[in-house]
Design a protein with these regions (language model features):
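Short, charged, low-complexity patches
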Residues: 87, 309-317, 344, 348
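Short beta-strand elements
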Residues: 280-286
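Glycine-rich phosphate/pyrophosphate-binding loops
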Residues: 327-335
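Conserved small/polar residues in nucleotide/adenosyl-binding loops
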Residues: 383-393
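Glycine/threonine-rich ATP-lid/beta-loop region of ATP-binding domains
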Residues: 111-113, 138-147, 151, 155-278, ...
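GHKL (Bergerat-fold) ATPase N-terminal catalytic module, capturing the glycine-rich phosphate-binding loop
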Residues: 1-177, 185, 192, 205
């Protein structure tokens, strides 16, 4: 077993992380699951290019609660780490393995991590963290432990299956994160569209009866994994793959309490000069414009970031609903706040142009239908849209 000090630029970074880095402690789960997703996508990429001589299979991420031990477990079946990689990526705060991986493999789409601090968000809710990991390479597993001080222990582990398990020993002031309802709520808030299946417990599923079943036959119930996320949401698909019913179903998935159908949708899909995907809906407003609920949601590589999209979406389009997903929108280190730059202005101008184009096509194709919808869409000034449409990017 080896011991050492975590390489940080201050004597103890953990109180700073807990107090200043993240505005909301609950996002630790988003960060840890994002890391697990990264590890799995890295393995997929390496197997695709022949660098990893292992079977990718159908990996998933599992989240488990152990109330008796007061622990929360996040388990992936991804790339794993060797002891040397744990030293490099875990013990050097702010050195991001995902960022280095992207630089080495420019075509590795979907890698989320940027700052290398996400793992340490665990210490916002845990007074001890364990990491047990086995690399896809033929090397021994490693077991890293830290109690929130700069000191850590690193020893061999008897783990035989590929991947990483993170064990959070939940602190007394964070016991709510040992409640199933709370973890379920957070998973659905931040991770419901992540690209890797996420298992949280099990559920009962009823099998259909065979055609020749007796009249008094009872259907069989089986226990299956409770997968909480949709790994292929509508905005990740090509418009040619989707029907109007698919778009409506996605709207209902985003806003289950909205009973009115949207008036129209706009599918965003750009890869130059910036990356932007998403689907925006123009809701039926009626006489009640409530801009505080059911807002546009911002994602980065299918990870929810915020629904505060001021700056990306112009003020006069904030009544739209839907999803925007872009890795090119700069965020602060905690991924909580937008940082305005040239890319954001270009994306904002593009969104405005797409809305203007859609409204123009509605007038051209079916003016009568457009006039019927006027009471709902007049809140967006057509003149205002056209003025913004002239912005160049």
């Amino acid at each position: 077993m080896s011991k050492g000090n975590i390489n940080v630029s201050v004597e103890n970074i953990f109180p700073l992380i807990k107090k200043f880095l993240y505005s909301d402690h609950e996002i630790f789960l988003r960060e840890l699951i994002s890391n697990a997703s990264d590890a799995t996508l890295k393995l997929k990429h390496l197997t695709n290019i022949g660098e990893a001589k292992v079977e990718y299979g159908n990996p998933k991420i599992e989240v488990k609660i152990n109330k008796e031990d007061k622990t929360l477990h996040i388990i992936d079946q991804g790339i794993g780490m060797t002891a040397d990689e744990v030293e490099k990526y875990i013990n050097q705060v702010a050195f991001s393995g995902a960022e280095e991986f992207i630089n080495q493999h420019k075509d590795a789409d979907g890698i989320i991590g940027h700052f290398g601090l996400g793992f340490y968000s665990a210490f916002m809710v845990a007074d001890k963290v364990e990491l047990i990991t086995k690399s896809y390479k033929d090397e021994p597993a490693a077991h890293w432990t830290c109690d929130g001080s700069p000191e850590f222990t690193l020893e061999k582990a008897d783990k035989t299956d590929r991947g990483t398990e993170i064990i959070l020993h939940i602190a007394e002031d964070s016991k709510e994160f040992l409640e199933e309802w709370k973890i379920n709520e957070l998973l659905h808030k931040y991770n419901k569209f992540m690209p890797i299946p996420i298992k949280f417990g099990t559920k009962k599923e009823t099998l259909p009866l065979p055609e020749d079943a007796a009249e008094d036959a009872k259907p069989e119930e089986i226990e299956v994994d409770n997968i909480i996320n949709n790994t292929q949401p509508a905005w990740t698909k090509s418009p040619s793959e989707l029907t109007d019913e698919d778009y409506l179903a996605f709207y209902r998935e985003l806003y289950p309490m909205q009973f009115e159908e949207p008036l129209f949708h706009i599918h965003l899909n750009v890869d130059y000069p910036f990356n932007l995907t998403g689907i925006l809906f123009f809701p039926k407003l009626g006489n009640n414009i409530n801009l505080d609920k059911d807002r546009i949601q911002l994602y980065q590589n299918q990870v929810f970031v915020t629904d505060e999209v001021n700056g990306i979406v112009p003020d006069f389009l904030m009544l739209l609903r839907g999803v925007i997903d872009s890795p090119d929108i700069p965020l602060n280190v905690s991924r909580s706040y937008l940082q305005a730059d040239g890319a954001v202005k270009k994306i904002s101008a593009h969104i405005t142009k797409k809305v203007a184009d859609k409204m123009s096509s509605l007038i051209t194709q079916n003016r009568e239908d457009y006039e019927k919808k006027w009471n709902d869409i007049k809140a967006v000034s057509y003149t205002h849209l056209r003025a913004h449409e002239t912005l160049r990017y």
